[in-house]
Amino acid sequence: MQVTDAHIIEEQKSTPVVKNQTTPVAENQLTPLIFRAVNQYLDINIIQPTESDSTKGFVKWGENNDYPQYLDSLYRDVATLQSIIEGTVDFITGNEVRIDDVVWNEKINDKDELPEELVRSISRDILKYGGFAINVVRNRGGRVGSLYYIPFERIRSNENNTEFYYSKDWSKSVGRVKYIKYPKFDPNKKDGSSIFYYSNNKTNTYPTPIWSAACKSAEIEKQVNEYHLNSIANGFSASYLISLNNGIPNEEIADEIEDSFIEKFTGSGNGGRLVISFANDKEHSAELNKLDVDDSGERYKSLIERARQQLFTAFRANPNLFGIPTENNGFNQEEYDKTFKLYNRTTVRPIQKIITQSLNYILDKTITITPFSLDDENKESDVIQK
């Protein structure tokens, strides 16, 4: 909670207020009115993708080893970001995913998961984090027998990506984290269980999400939504100036009074604010007035529109592809086809190629992704395979 003190003085000079005691009223004494603006706010903390060695062999991703968890939280809390990612996942997965093998095409592991489910999961991680991980398990004969999707936020790596560490919870201190260590997948080795790891960043240990330049924009949309939620929680009530006329308390007592008002009468965030005034007597007190606040609707509308546009720009995507209309309401089939063709070439097909090449490297099988189509009709030349 941020507290701002402001002093309104009746003349240029005033008698200093004695700290840590209630100030008595004296005749003809010039008394300052001390206003404490109770400004509740959500602390914006944009986590940076720093990399630093730990004593356990893996490289920490983020100062507290929580950068991927931060990205995941933005994905879950920012509707525009989630819409872009989920829509693009649909485009990448296409209408059908097939492996040129009867057994593999029916299931990829003992959970009876289909190839399409694996492609959907790893394409989502590529879009969220810039990388993905697959647990490759060999059978007793030494051949690849199962593939398991590993949520990328649960993986950490050593510096050169030859050893990987899996944990369901990296939030604990390094010494208390329980993890499983895996070697890097090598088609020429017979490791019983290993990790295939893909990163779009070949110079660092960890990848870079394609929307990393728009993290601040995602944070803006999240915070604006929090503001409106807190406005609802506060009943859209206007701010008030509350005058307490029994003297000016010391700072400790003033803080306690503030906390009591906040706990009982306000919600969290910036949706509603209280301003509390302390004065020696009624003669020197401020009047109790409802404080007019600016209509924030229009102010935040332009802000959130710009934030959304930055997110679409980061993905090189057109909002109309994801059901979000733009100022130009006209978007006919021809325009849709042209827009999708461009997005398909610049974003969708490159990721499809990464996935098919990766699965081909692991399985030594041909992987085919039939492109996304609204009418379920695809030209043979559009099929992505490796």
Stretches with model-predicted labels:
Residues 2-280, 385:
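Structured, contiguous alpha/beta core segments that scaffold functional sites
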Residues 2-3, 7, 350, 354, ...:
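C-terminal anchoring/interaction modules
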Residues 200-358, 368-373:
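A contiguous, surface-oriented mixed alpha/beta subdomain in the mid-to-C-terminal portion of proteins
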Residues 79, 93, 312, 316, ...:
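Hydrophobic/aromatic-lined pockets within catalytic cores
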